[in-house]
Amino acid sequence: MSLTRLLIKDFRNIENADLALSPGFNFLVGANGSGKTSVLEAIYTLGHGRAFRSLQVGRVIRHEQESFILHGRLQGSERETSIGLTKDKQGDSKVRIDGTDGHKVAELALLMPMQLITPEGFTLLNGGPKYRRAFLDWGCFHNEAGFFNAWSNLKRLLKQRNAALRQVTRYAQVRPWDMELVPLAEQISRWRAEYSAGIAEDMADTCKQFLPEFSLTFSFQRGWEKETDYAEVLERSFERDRMLTYTAHGPHKADFRIRADGAPVEDTLSRGQLKLLMCALRLAQGEFLTRESGRRCLYLIDDFASELDDARRGLLASRLKATQSQVFVSAISAEHVLDMSDKNSKMFTVEKGKITD
């Protein structure tokens, strides 16, 4: 499914924009601060309900306005879908799909699977475990129909259990939460383990093409000891959890470790190599989705030339074209993307929030 039309109103520095888009490559060219990243962020927000540069909604609403409006048309193989998102300064959202209100942001995310590659995206590799859990959970969300509800219930139960730990003195007092928590935790961990195992070959093949000089390995760690029942871990850790006032073990502590030649990638690879690895992982994830479900990812790439030389930019461009996915690329200069363009691509110029093609 590709985004054929995008309407933006009062988002960042963009007052109004109505863009007819290519199902292939779409290039956004402009100086720093022109608004090209804001277009990428508008697309991301339409599919996630939140921006990727700020969690504070007031910062993405145009100055002196009360809300932003985003609208898109998605073209699938058999039908067109209309989607919209409105959000005000209080954080209240309204999601519309095919003209009807009352929908959830998760429905937008299912309709618009997308991969984001930004200069700040190194956190996937050198940030905390939560970024790598998010990587796995993206895949589980799009591959397992029950994942989102299970994950939402897990978060709710952990919050309730942590609150209870501040008030109780005996394990029996938190057992009711644990009886619900354990099966959810084990199911989510199984999904994550299955997904990480399923995508491992795709990641290895893609990384070998991007970084042939390294031997890369991937390992999923579920968040508690191997070969130990989660129920046993919770009961055994109760006193420590009560002192900490939070649950120290579980799927919320899982990680997905990536090593190069046996060492953590953040200690081994240069910034340029880290960006290549990040691109390889995002590509592998999108290609795995297509193979498993027939759906294609939408790729958002901010500051395409950053950290990459001409040869590596060419490699990334050729791999993206091979996916036959819709791609949005921002760049300071058209020269950085001219060799990627073809008769089906579109070039947009962005200047002070105004977008022309």
Swiss-Prot record:
Signal peptide: none
Biological-process GO terms, alphabetical: DNA replication; DNA synthesis involved in DNA repair; double-strand break repair; SOS response
Classification via InterPro entries: DNA-binding_RecF, DNA-binding_RecF_CS, P-loop_NTPase, RecF/RecN/SMC_N, RecF_2
GO terms for cellular component: cytoplasm
The keyword DNA damage is annotated on this UniProt entry: yes
Annotated positions binding ATP: 30-37
Location of this chain's protein in the cell: Cytoplasm
Chief location category: cytoplasm
Family: Belongs to the RecF family.
Biological function: The RecF protein is involved in DNA metabolism; it is required for DNA replication and normal SOS inducibility. RecF binds preferentially to single-stranded, linear DNA. It also seems to bind ATP.
Name used for this protein in its record: DNA replication and repair protein RecF
